[in-house]
């Protein structure tokens, strides 16, 4: 049971955003390889594992199906060292302010999702939940360093 718990912990901490599931797939593959007869990756990145049953025909079959991707964020712009972003998957923007993220740039960078203070928002927006168009990721780095380490299209996981 401890081994299962550790494997699950490892899986949920991996950056396996939709379309970029390779890290998660490799961990799952390593865990399943000793348990199955065949394992392969489809052209679209799905992992297929097969184990032959024992006993007389007809043998029962079991299908275990699960997704291995996770929701996350993608950098869409860089403004004075702050990162603009959009969602990858179904991210509810209400959960984002104050969320710690990892930006997967030229190296992994810790970041925090921040929003402007109320006095910088339009009066109608003050005191309310803001949309993603008002949120940024702040890595705490100077603008030049962010420009060197992060590119538009880089991902951020949480």
What are these regions (language model features)?
Residues 1-158:
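N-terminal hydrophobic/helix-forming segments and targeting peptides
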């Amino acid at each position: 049971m401890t081994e299962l718990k550790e494997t699950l912990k490892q899986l949920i901490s991996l950056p396996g955003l939709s379309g970029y599931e390779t890290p998660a797939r490799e961990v799952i593959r390593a865990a399943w390889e000793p348990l199955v007869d065949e394992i392969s990756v489809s052209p679209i990145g799905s992992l297929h594992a097969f184990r032959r049953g024992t006993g007389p025909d007809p043998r029962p079959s079991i299908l275990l199906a699960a997704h291995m991707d996770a929701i996350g964020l993608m950098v869409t712009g860089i403004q004075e060292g702050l990162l603009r972003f959009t969602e990858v998957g179904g991210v509810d923007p209400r959960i984002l302010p104050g969320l710690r993220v990892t930006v997967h740039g030229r190296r992994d960078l810790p970041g925090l999702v921040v929003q402007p203070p109320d006095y910088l928002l339009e009066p109608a927006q003050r005191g309310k939940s803001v949309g993603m168009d008002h949120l940024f990721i702040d890595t705490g780095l100077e603008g030049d360093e962010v420009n060197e380490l992060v590119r538009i299209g880089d991902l951020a996981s949480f």
